[in-house]
Curated annotation (Swiss-Prot):
SUPFAM superfamilies: S-adenosyl-L-methionine-dependent methyltransferases (SSF53335)
Biological role: The METTL3-METTL14 heterodimer forms a N6-methyltransferase complex that methylates adenosine residues at the N(6) position of some mRNAs and regulates the circadian clock, differentiation of embryonic stem cells and cortical neurogenesis. In the heterodimer formed with METTL3, METTL14 constitutes the RNA-binding scaffold that recognizes the substrate rather than the catalytic core. N6-methyladenosine (m6A), which takes place at the 5'-[AG]GAC-3' consensus sites of some mRNAs, plays a role in mRNA stability and processing.
Gene Ontology terms: biological process: forebrain radial glial cell differentiation; gliogenesis; mRNA destabilization; mRNA modification; mRNA processing; mRNA splicing, via spliceosome; mRNA stabilization; negative regulation of hematopoietic progenitor cell differentiation
Composition skew (Gly residues), residue ranges: 409-423, 441-450
One GO term describing the cellular component: nucleus
Biased composition (Basic and acidic residues): 425-440
Protein name: N(6)-adenosine-methyltransferase non-catalytic subunit METTL14
Modified-residue entries (Phosphoserine), positions: 399
Keyword Nucleus on entry: yes
InterPro entries to which the protein is assigned, alphabetical: METTL14-like (IPR045123), MT-A70-like (IPR007757), SAM-dependent_MTases_sf (IPR029063)
Pfam families tied to this protein: MT-A70
Subcellular location: Nucleus
């Protein structure tokens, strides 16, 4: 206790010395000569008491606190002098221009000193895109923590490699070539048109003819598509998102998925591209629209599709400026999903020639396509399918089995209990259209009529 009291006295003595220097007094003992006399202080106290009586209740709590705590005028004056001294010391400090260096001043949360994952601000600071920090995006390490899926992918890749046809390719100007000559009908069609958008973004002159969406719509894709088939259309990231859907409808497809290619810049952070004149921001992704033709249900058509094996995202490093190559992962997604072996790649290049695919494009340097030879690979019944092993069937994700009518609530068992003409809940009424039984003509979830009107 004595040490604490001694510490307080020393601090008070030091405070009085600082006040003496601030007020121009000779010593700490002569501060009273500089300050108001006792009579003047008494007058000030009386004035404060008078003002306190009429003090507005809306005044700041800090001001009322000083009056309520009963502090002496000398203590208040000392505190005021301390604040004044601190303020003057801050004003005397040399001015330093604040230079923005990082995002530490923009932390999320007012009570936290920990930097949060503000990847957008980090991109402004370093040039690293937010997608650079997504983990396990490669084909090799994507399923490291999912052994069941990893084994499924391995088995499917082995089966696909065994069932693939030899690679075939045809050098042809697709604009002048009649694609109806390609036989037989295809289960999967991949279109990779050289859109003007790709070259407009990079500012590089195209070394091949750029296709407009009007040109793409003129392709007779519906003539070479099987009744039950899928199409994958690379459409960029601009107007192609809408015009690509128009193409799918024209060819008889329904859009069922949108595969998004997210481009990272780990190897070259901060790189800026030529801004597309039609864009507000720099685009770092592209879209591949997926369409379905015919009736294909994942719960019943397990011989033709295996759903939920891959995701609808492709995350790879952005190619060099002028390179319009698409990621090879799109082929893996298609082959894992659709079990059809008749696969066509339009606007292909030498680098995209692949077993199991017929590649057609104007930039190919050679051709080996023979219609009869290609058709012979699928002459046997159901030979257009890759097939499936028992182990793959066991491992692959499946849809829940369809419920029976009694489980869904339809049919007679539920209709007689909750709805229908003899409703089980509630007492019978003599009125023919009484609706208190949750059934009758109102349609009591399984009764004779689903809605409020009889069927036409």
């Amino acid at each position: 206790m004595d040490s604490r009291l001694q510490e307080i006295r020393e601090r008070q003595k030091l405070r009085r010395q600082l006040l003496a220097q601030q007020l121009g007094a000779e010593s700490a003992d002569s501060i009273g000569a500089v300050l108001n006399s006792k009579d003047e202080q008494r007058e000030i106290a009386e004035t404060r008491e008078t003002c306190r009586a009429s003090y507005d209740t809306s005044a700041p709590n800090a001001k009322r606190k000083y009056l309520d705590e009963g502090e002496t005028d000398e203590d208040k004056m000392e505190e005021y002098k301390d604040e004044l001294e601190m303020q003057q010391d801050e004003e005397n400090l040399p001015y330093e221009e604040e230079i923005y260096k990082d995002s530490s001043t923009f932390l999320k949360g007012t009570q936290s000193l920990n930097p949060h994952n503000d990847y957008c601000q980090h991109f402004v600071d370093t040039g690293h895109r937010p997608q650079n920090f997504i983990r396990d995006v490669g084909l090799a390490d994507r399923f490291e923590e999912y052994p069941k899926l990893r084994e499924l992918i391995r088995l499917k890749d082995e089966l696909i490699a065994k069932s693939n046809t030899p690679p075939m390719y045809l050098q042809a100007d697709i604009e002048a070539f009649d694609i109806r000559e390609l036989t037989p009908k295809f289960d999967v069609i991949l279109l990779e048109p050289p859109l003007e958008e790709y070259y407009r973004e990079t500012g590089i002159t195209a070394n091949e003819k750029c296709w407009t969406w009007d040109d793409i719509m003129k392709l007779e894709i519906d003539e070479i598509a099987a009744p039950r088939s899928f199409i994958f259309l690379w459409c960029g990231s601009g107007e192609g998102l809408d015009l690509g859907r128009v193409c799918l409808r024209k060819w008889g497809y329904r859009r069922c998925e949108d595969i998004c290619w997210i481009k990272t810049n780990k190897n070259n952070p901060g790189k800026t591209k030529t801004l597309d004149p039609k864009a507000v921001f720099q685009r770092t992704k592209e879209h591949c629209l997926m369409g379905i033709k015919g009736t294909v249900k994942r719960s019943t058509d397990g011989d033709f599709i295996h759903a939920n094996v891959d995701i609808d995202l492709i995350i790879t490093e952005e190619p060099e400026i002028g390179n319009i190559e698409k990621p090879v992962e799109i082929f893996h997604i298609i082959e894992h999903f659709c079990l059809g072996r008749r696969r066509l790649h339009l606007f292909g290049r030498d680098s995209t020639i692949r077993p199991g695919w017929l590649t057609v494009g104007p930039t190919l340097t050679n051709s080996n396509y023979n219609a009869e030879t290609y058709a012979s690979y699928f002459s046997a019944p159901n030979s257009y399918l890759t097939g499936c092993t028992e182990e793959i069937e066991r491992l692959r994700p499946k849809s829940p089995p369809p419920k029976s009518k009694s489980d869904r609530g339809g049919g007679a068992p539920r209709g007689g209990g909750r709805g229908g003409t003899s409703a089980g809940r509630g007492r019978e009424r003599n009125r023919s259209n009484f609706r208190g039984e949750r059934g009758g003509f109102r349609g009591g979830r399984g009764g004779a009529h689903r809605g409020g009107f009889p069927p036409r």
